[in-house]
Amino acid sequence: MPILRPLVIASLVLLVSNACADGVPNDCTQLILAIAPTWNSLRGELRLFERSGGGQWARVAGPFPVLFGKNGLAWGTGVAGQNEPGLRKQERDGRAPAGIFEIGQIFGYDPRLPPGGDYPYHQVTEADVWSDDPRSPNYNRHIVIDPKKPPDNYTHEKMRSGDFAYQWLVEIRHNSDPPVPGAGSAIFFHIRRGVNRPTTGCTTMAKENLVRMITWLRVKGHPCYALLPAVEYDRKWRSWNLPPPETLNRSSGAHAQP
């Protein structure tokens, strides 16, 4: 028995560390938080939060309206959410990935970010592609190709399509490390196409709100995105290190519904 005790203690420590692994990382001081009324909601509210070190979250912008997938939400794969039971995000399911995700690079048509922007940025050309083909070794990756020899899916994978909604693309790092074929790809923040036009999995908003977010982002803030239906936010905000409910000033439609 004395010999087994250290093993038992070590196992308990491992279990505790795993239980605490999910949630906003300690080095994240910029948080984008979106809440949907239900799993099947097409729309919700988004807020921007900041904190110093491990301090309390303070709301710096929002709420403002956003649109999600045309079929609602499903659990994604990122910093947190991948270990939750329930419906999983799949390619072309029309659902936005729920959970917590790191923010990747910003892509866009313009030579540089909007005034005030200071974040890794790549101006896309006709050579820039984001693969959504689960059969491709480059699935859910940004790649640069020879436009004279485009891949089979080039017409819908090219990032400079001329679509005004893609003027700015802020990468949401779902299913990224490494990508699992078929688990969902090309998830971004971008400009909405209309107030009643949900997406196939991205989170969209009015242009002025997207620009506000882009100019706020900083690499040193290790920004993350948390997207949850209200019932999951109410269950997890404390254990996932999210802003407490009293900081949200939620509208009635953003509360958990039975």
Where are these regions (language model features)?
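Positively charged n-region of N-terminal signal peptides that target proteins for export
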Residues: M1-R5
